[in-house]
Amino acid sequence: MIFPFAVRLDGGGRMLDGAQGVYARSLARTLAERLSRPPRLQARVAQLTADGPLDGDDGAEGHGFIVASKAWTLEEACHVDLPEGTEYLLHGSAELTDRVRIRILLVDSPQKHLALDHVVLRPRQELFAALDEAAAEVAHALGEEPRREPWPTRDVEAYVAYLRGRDLSAAHEMGVAVPEPRRSFDPYLEAVRRDPDFADAQERLLALALSLAARGHAGAEAARSACCSLLALQPRAFKACLALAEIELLERNPRAAEERISRALAIEPGWAPAFERMGTSLLRQRRFGEAVGWFERALRGRKDDPAALQGLGTALAECGRVEEAMGCWRAALVSGVATADLHENLARGHLLLGHRSDARRHRTISRRIRGTPRFGLDLLRNAWQWLSNGPGAGR
């Protein structure tokens, strides 16, 4: 269990440099990820939050991440409650200015002794070597040999910007009130500006964009702007086109989504996940015949793609090919999908085929998943179907 590293505070109890809190959390997170590579090691990061501003007075109504003001003593560390199965606690202090300084304190919690006390001190431009050294020292203290994993970029300043972005992403994931969410993308954009091939920075920007877009129109506008900025920096970032398509679908604009997906496929024609999204955009435009071909193309790449199976089923049903549609929906059910919408589709399909008892069964399951009670017209419809077929009718 790795806790955010301590940073120095001024006489008023505030960090001497607010960025140091970001780097303390980020370096701890990075170290945990590097230590989780060997087969027998698995590190987890503890998240610390507290009431108060995240960044100045603008965030006073929200919650902010905190880091400790000093490294814990051995006695304090041994009294920290750890999750079951966790044997070691890693803590210390960190500083990232024109140099990297990390003090690592590795505590064997069951034995209540210090397994490692090591200081890493290197110039800022040797950040990657400093983190590799820290991970190696911890692994050796645990009797393991660390793997040498490549870094996602060799540009230190791009990586430092990326760390700031990771910290903001973590804040959004934990529900921390972040001032000016639109600016949460700036660190990732800086990382890509410094290293246009920094793929992980692009991926995390897009993940954050989709997360914010799902929260409402304001988030969608910020996400759309960030994706467009990424495309301006890296015109071949086809996944940014696909993220923009998702935003258009969320905003109920399938025609614009189709255009975005077409642009992505012009850059990367063989990207199979785009086939299903193209089918979905056509489906929402009620262009069912065209959608069938795209869903079938998606399933040639992955036969058990649940989204493609459900989409193909809907398109086929709208084209009057109900038996084939039922086959797709059943395959989606077998693949593990158990949504109310899928059971509702199965109920409608069974009803069209005259299988009324099966239709009632799936409608009941759909209602149970949605938490919808049986009353009024539902009871009347079921009673009428039962009377129409007789008490012994099965199909």
Predicted regions and their residues:
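Catalytic-center loop of serine/cysteine hydrolases
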Residues: 24-30, 34-174, 179-181
